[in-house]
Amino acid sequence: DIFDDFKTTGRESNWDQIIQVGAILTNSNFQEIDKFEARCRLQPDIIPYPKAILVNKSSMIDLTQTNLSHFSLIELMMKKFKSWGTATYIGYNSISFDEEFLRKTLFKNLLNPYLTINNGNKRSDLLNIIRANHIYYPDSIKIPLNEKGKLSFKLDQIAPLNGIKNFNAHDALGDAIATIKLAEIINIQNPRLWEASLLTSTRESTEKEIDNNKLFCITETFFGKIMPFVV
């Protein structure tokens, strides 16, 4: 599996850019085999969103004086990913955020935008897995509450609450490490849920599960509220 995370200049995948990539290749026991981390400088036409830069702990020196260009960062990333071969790409909130940036960034650089779903590759999102885990096994992963008393699934809050402390939050490689540790906890405590979640990591395998099971459960999230459905 490849656990990856991107840090960006903002939330708009159409206009913002990736500034840091962190990725870790693991075996089936979540042990690190190899890793990749790199930063790049701002593209000339990009104005970073201040809050994003504060959260990512990036300085103007990082953004303007880093030797690596944006294209070179993507080129190095793709070279590393290809060397790792076919894999399941797993991130945290990756389907709605990181994957959007990856797909559009590859397209803009004239590369195959569907890296994580072509050539035998698969993709999954640990945020959705943790949400499902909370519905079916609520005591296995501790979920904090925000200031409004609602469940908060932010990685930098969930990880330390579950004993994961040796990682640099809001750093691409640090968040990839935290994602691995949380995935390992779920696999140890609820292996059936972990295995079931990976059965929907491709369109074909998802369709197969739907066709082969007359009854199954899915979870959806609406405005922060997790709702299970029997289908």
Positions of predicted regions on the chain:
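Residue-level detector of family-conserved "landmark" positions at structurally sensitive sites
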Residues: L63, T116, A169-H170
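Acidic, Mg2+-coordinating catalytic module of metal-dependent nucleases/exonucleases
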Residues: T88-N93, F97, F101, T105, ...
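Acidic two-metal-ion nuclease catalytic site recognized across multiple nuclease folds
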Residues: E184-V231
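A mobile, often basic/glycine-rich helix-loop segment
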Residues: L111-N119
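Short alpha-helix plus adjacent loop in nuclease-associated cores
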Residues: N118-L145
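Conserved non-catalytic scaffold segment of RNase H-like nuclease domains
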Residues: D1-L111, S152, Q157-N162
